[in-house]
Amino acid sequence: TLKIKKKFLRRKKQIIGFKDANRTTNFKIKFPYIFSPSDLRIIGVLIGDGNVRNDRVMLRWIQNDTTPLKKLLSSKIQGYHFSNRETNQLIIPSFFGKITCSLLNLKGDEIDTYKLIEKVIDYPKEYRLALLISLIEDEGNIDPKNYSGISIRMSDKKIVYFIKLLCESLGYETSKITKYKNNRYSFGEGNVMYKLKILSEGIFNLGYDLIKFEKKFGKENSLWKKRKNFFKRWEICAGKKSRKDKEGREIHQK
């Protein structure tokens, strides 16, 4: 974290605002700007249901309800106002793309690819966790009644591979990556997809880390719509582990 802060202290301190190419008003951003896990929670959505256009100028996130990200953005920068009207598309201020590319030495068209994950794997735990939260929110399938784990499905094998590495760096047990064909929305042979599961032991550890993360950074930086189902699933994992540990102690005592 110290290394990250030192990098930002070298930025010009006389900067007093930032004008986004997509807006007419200036954003009020305090400099020197400290790059935090919250920034990765924001920029991480681009890997899932987002995309980058015009070399970081247009950062777009598509979701049925964009309100949680709007609220997070408004808490980060003064002057960011949003309407309560429900929309399925949100333009993220290009500032976040530019500052991320500058710090992580990424090109503008790389922040929605596996390269973002690759760079973050060497960052402190809270940064890695923030990025994983974004990926689970967009691409994870959490069924409290399904004991097979949290499924992450994507068509980009390399992204799934680096998500696996990200999970391993955090100590979360995962399955092997499996390949399958998704025939649901296609004709003919179907689209090739890749699936990774965060297993029960991984969910157990992730749950405790998520609780600590929320206490430090707030629930707005955590899971949003999938939070409720995650903790239902986590409680099942915690209960199973508790019973397993108890049985293990009883065996050793005999």
Residue ranges and their predicted role:
Residues 1-254:
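Internal intein/HINT superfamily modules and their associated LAGLIDADG
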